[in-house]
C-alpha cells in the first residue's frame, strides 16, 4: 500500500524524516523534493565499472544551466530523508517528464532505513535549462509485510552530497 499525503504528514518525525520539510510540498500521496544547485559530470569516457570514475562539479546558477542530451548529470535532492518501517520510492514529476527530463535511470527504489540525500541520475532528451531549487521529483512510501531489516551498507548510507557510482567496491569482495 502507498501512504496518503495525510499519512506521510502524520509520520513526519517518526518513520519519516525530511529535512528541510515544508507542508507546501506535500501531495495527495507523495512529497515533492527539490534539485540542489550542484551537479557532477563524469570527465573520462568510457566509464569503467571496476574503478572510481572522475567527475567535475558544476553549479546551477540562479539564471539557469543548459543541460544537453547524451550527458549523464548526477545531481541530488536539496532535502535529505530518513525512512524507517517503510520503503521509500522516488519518481520524477510529470511536469518535469513533459519537458523531456529524467531524474533517475534505475535508482528510484530506496531501502528501509536509508538516510541521506537522493542522488539523481539526470538526463534530458532535448536541450533544457534547469534551475536550482525546482521541485523535480517526488518521494512516496510503501508499507511492508514481514520482519524488517534496515539498510546498513556503508556504500551510500548517510551521504553528505552527490555520489558517483561505487560499483567498483563490489569487485573488491
UniProtKB/Swiss-Prot annotation:
DCTP binds at residues 93-98, 111, 119-121, 138. Disulfide bonds: none annotated. Pathway: Pyrimidine metabolism; dUMP biosynthesis; dUMP from dCTP: step 1/1. Coiled coil: none annotated. Gene3D superfamilies: 2.70.40.10. The keyword Transmembrane helix does not apply. One of its GO terms (biological process) is dUTP biosynthetic process. InterPro entries: dCTP_deaminase (IPR011962), dUTPase-like_sf (IPR036157), dUTPase_trimeric (IPR033704). GO terms for molecular function: dCTP deaminase (dUMP-forming) activity; dCTP deaminase activity; nucleotide binding. It comes from the Bacteria. The active site is at 121 (proton donor/acceptor). It catalyses: dCTP + 2 H2O = dUMP + NH4(+) + diphosphate. The record marks 108-109 as: Important for bifunctional activity. Its EC number is 3.5.4.30. Keywords: Hydrolase, Nucleotide metabolism, Nucleotide-binding. Homotrimer. Belongs to the dCTP deaminase family. Bifunctional enzyme that catalyzes both the deamination of dCTP to dUTP and the hydrolysis of dUTP to dUMP without releasing the toxic dUTP intermediate. This is dCTP deaminase, dUMP-forming. It comes from Leptospira interrogans serogroup Icterohaemorrhagiae serovar Lai (strain 56601). The lineage of its organism: Bacteria, Pseudomonadati, Spirochaetota, Spirochaetia, Leptospirales. The gene is dcd.
Amino acid at each position: 500500500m502507498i501512504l496518503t499525503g495525510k499519512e506521510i504528514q502524520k509520520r513526519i518525525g517518526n518513520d519519516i524524516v525530511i529535512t528541510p520539510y515544508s507542508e507546501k510540498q506535500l501531495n495527495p500521496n507523495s512529497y515533492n523534493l527539490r534539485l540542489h544547485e550542484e551537479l557532477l559530470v563524469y570527465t573520462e569516457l568510457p566509464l569503467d565499472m571496476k574503478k572510481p570514475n572522475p567527475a567535475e562539479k558544476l553549479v546551477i546558477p540562479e539564471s539557469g544551466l543548459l543541460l544537453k542530451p547524451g550527458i549523464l548529470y548526477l545531481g541530488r535532492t536539496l532535502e535529505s530523508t530518513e525512512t524507517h518501517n517503510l520503503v521509500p520510492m522516488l519518481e520524477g514529476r510529470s511536469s518535469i517528464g513533459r519537458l523531456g527530463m529524467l531524474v533517475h535511470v534505475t535508482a528510484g527504489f530506496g531501502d528501509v532505513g536509508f538516510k541521506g540525500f537522493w542522488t539523481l541520475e539526470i538526463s534530458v532528451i532535448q536541450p533544457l535549462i534547469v534551475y536550482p531549487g525546482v521541485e523535480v521529483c517526488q518521494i512516496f512510501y510503501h508499507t511492508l509485510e514481514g520482519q524488517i531489516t534496515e539498510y546498513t551498507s556503508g556504500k551510500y548510507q548517510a551521504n553528505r552530497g552527490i555520489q558517483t557510482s561505487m560499483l567498483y567496491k563490489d569487485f573488491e569482495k
